[in-house]
From Swiss-Prot:
Involved in transcription antitermination. Required for transcription of ribosomal RNA (rRNA) genes. Binds specifically to the boxA antiterminator sequence of the ribosomal RNA (rrn) operons. Belongs to the NusB family. GO terms for cellular component: cytosol. Pfam families: NusB (PF01029). It comes from Bradyrhizobium diazoefficiens (strain JCM 10833 / BCRC 13528 / IAM 13628 / NBRC 14792 / USDA 110). GO terms for biological process: DNA-templated transcription termination; transcription antitermination. GO terms for molecular function: RNA binding. Keywords: RNA-binding, Transcription, Transcription antitermination, Transcription regulation. This is Transcription antitermination protein NusB.
Amino acid sequence: MADNNKKPAGLTEKKANRRGAARLAAVQALYQMDIAGAGINDIFAEFESHWLGNEVEGDTYLPAEAAFFRDVVSGVVRDQKKLDPLIDEALSKGWPLKRIEAILRAVLRAGAYELQHRKDVPGRVVVSEYVDVANAFVDREETGMVNAVLDQIGRQFRGDEFGRG
């Protein structure tokens, strides 16, 4: 008997791709805010009109789920003072967040926010997605650090998914 409530595979995959694009855009936006001191409203306007789903300097950006993009960026901005100490605790001793490259700070903040607040997304998916985002910018050693830090944060907020310890 066929399951008529089942969604076509393409819809789920398309949503996942749009969320992945939103994560990449969110990290880029957070990086830009960190480096250039841009305000959140300017960032939203710029990314939504010029980046999301458009061609920029010869690169075509995938359409992104704008609401997800906005949630991650605004959530990180709102909760940064709570997120940064969590990330600091998960980093190796002697490597506080302020010593980490700005792009990695953006990746870790976005991932930590999503692990803490976006329970609609499985924790291991969050970690994997942000490792993939980091891979677009840094080498393998640094993506390993992203994986380890987000895994530790995931265990803190989603022990049932990750297993505690």
